[in-house]
């Protein structure tokens, strides 16, 4: 298992209170593969640095998790298929 950090930018037309439950359904991919979700941090609505699909605002969420590379790849694939997800970024933080 490796440690990953995923940042997701969602469409600002969504209600902020529905963001965490909707992300939780996607995170079941990680749980069924034997991984664990350590923390889900919803930053809320923020202005984008540049327009994405003619949108100037997005809802940011950061997720810390432990998972296999295959499970993270499947999660990223499912997030890309969702129309309300504007961008995703998966990183492996440096070990200190």
UniProtKB/Swiss-Prot annotation:
HAMAP family: Ribosomal_bS6. The gene is rpsF. This is Small ribosomal subunit protein bS6. Binds together with bS18 to 16S ribosomal RNA. It comes from Salinispora arenicola (strain CNS-205). Belongs to the bacterial ribosomal protein bS6 family. GO terms for cellular component: cytoplasm; ribonucleoprotein complex; ribosome. Keywords: Ribonucleoprotein, Ribosomal protein, RNA-binding, rRNA-binding. InterPro entries: Ribosomal_bS6, Ribosomal_bS6_sf, Ribosomal_S6_plastid/chlpt, Transl_elong_EF1B/ribsomal_bS6. The lineage of its organism: Bacteria, Bacillati, Actinomycetota, Actinomycetes, Micromonosporales. GO terms for biological process: translation. One of its GO terms (molecular function) is small ribosomal subunit rRNA binding. It comes from the Bacteria. The keyword RNA-binding applies.
């Amino acid at each position: 298992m490796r440690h990953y950090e995923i940042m997701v930018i969602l469409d600002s037309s969504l209600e902020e209170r529905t963001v965490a439950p909707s992300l939780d359904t996607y995170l079941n991919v990680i749980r069924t593969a034997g991984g664990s979700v350590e923390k889900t941090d919803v930053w809320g609505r923020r202005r984008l640095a540049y327009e994405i699909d003619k949108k100037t605002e997005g809802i940011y969420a950061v997720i810390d998790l432990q998972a296999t590379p295959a499970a993270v790849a499947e999660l990223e694939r499912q997030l890309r298929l969702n129309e309300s997800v504007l961008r995703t970024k998966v990183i492996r933080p440096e070990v200190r």
